[in-house]
From Swiss-Prot:
It comes from Streptomyces coelicolor (strain ATCC BAA-471 / A3(2) / M145). Facilitates transcription termination by a mechanism that involves Rho binding to the nascent RNA, activation of Rho's RNA-dependent ATPase activity, and release of the mRNA from the DNA template. This is Transcription termination factor Rho. GO terms for biological process: DNA-templated transcription termination. One of its GO terms (molecular function) is ATP binding.
Amino acid sequence: MSEVLFPAVRRRVVRPLARLFPSLRMSHARVLERTDHMTTTLEHPPVQHAQADIASGVLDIETGGKGRLRGRNLQPEPADPALSPALIRRHGLRRGDLVEGVCGDRRTLTDVVRVNGRTPDRRSRPHFADLTPLHPHERLRLEHPAAGLAGRVVDLLAPVGKGQRGLIVAPPKTGKTVLLQQFAAAVAGNHPEARLMVVLLDERPEEVTDMRRSVRGEVYSSTFDRSARQHIALAELVIERAKRLVEAGEDVVILLDSLTRLCRAHNNAASSGGRTLSGGVDAGALLGPKRFFGAARKAEEGGSLTILATALVETGSRADDFYFEELKSTGNMELRLSREPASRRVFPAVEPVGSGTRREELLLSGAETTALRGLRRALVARDGQSGLETLLERLRRTPDNATFLRQVQPTLPAG
């Protein structure tokens, strides 16, 4: 019965009172607080909370300090609610916060009710830059039925941990898009506690649709018909949103396709007056991509940000080669894809010898470390194509990696 009566109470009692706020000297937030108490008492879902007067979205702070609440794809829209610089300062809001507030005339927020799902409290919020980064030591398993053999191969050759900063080095037509979809399915299936974000930059619209339909997570896109500055703005807002979640102690996984295109966008948007490096790259073009990729970390205080980003190679562009050479040393995990197996329709087209993870022993048990090092030595002893095909064939015969390692360990070289 309460579910029927409460909207009527709001319509006939609460909203008329709202017109008296100035004379009563009572803020919107105070009335909403009382309204929330009524909602809880009547056991009504919070989603009914002041539907006509509440706006929510991810905060984007523009030049000059004014804020806007971005919607589903984090792209600017004319109807995005605005926040004044004073309101942002009063509540200590940061770019990337999920803000819920009272929306007055002209789509402008007059007060803030919740920040990231909680009551605003600027004093208890840590700053991302103050969190202590650690080597990843908690496993992010990609072995999952929805990931096929790809997840199992990565767990064996280049294990991923929470807070990993990984590059997927991909020549053209080596299956990187399908690989990202499989990774997304594995993360969603094995780690429902993690917030999954897929970021597609300078991509074809049909690829975006395919990704949205196949991924159980948040998919953000800026297609090839948008400007370089729009690509950059989306990437910056996504990474700021991820930082706010990590500050709250959450685990976030970002799959970016691609880091190379983000570098291209920064280079195209850079002023032509700067110093030019190899391949026509502006000297400051890599600062933005490095900030994005460098945000990945495991925080000692809790929370983590994992970024697996594709890097395009063998494209015929000197600039793309330069981007990769500059960025490859910043990661702590690398998965190399190869054209040779891909041309023979052997997938996942992983290059076993060139793939690996720094400090992988922190993610593995002692027995796993010994077994995987023996497996890598056995693969190095073969040529790349033969080693990969043998590995995939043996994996198909076993239900999981644990069984596979038990079966092959007696035959692996010691050392």
